[in-house]
Amino acid sequence: MSKCSADETPVCCCMDVGTIMDNSDCTASYSRVFANRAEAEQTLAALTEKARSVESEPCKITPTFTEESDGVRLDIDFTFACEAEMLIFQLGLR
């Protein structure tokens, strides 16, 4: 059997994990509108705690609060040290 590449594999639906996870995308984004800022801040605190539980190096957390007609929009970017941490964080939210 020859060495496999991402383009050809001897088994259906099989490829090297490095082909999928190459650390090119280490940022997870979150966006939601809340009734008030207090609810948005509670969610930010909970998501920050989840991010801190999977980080190997400090995760850069960038929240933005925007007043809208129907409440407060919370947008957050979580930038992890590696893509695996970002995936673990996202899967933990499901």
Curated annotation (Swiss-Prot):
Pfam families: DUF406. One of its GO terms (cellular component) is cytosol. It comes from the Bacteria. InterPro entries: DUF406, UPF0234-like_C. Belongs to the UPF0381 family. This is UPF0381 protein YfcZ.
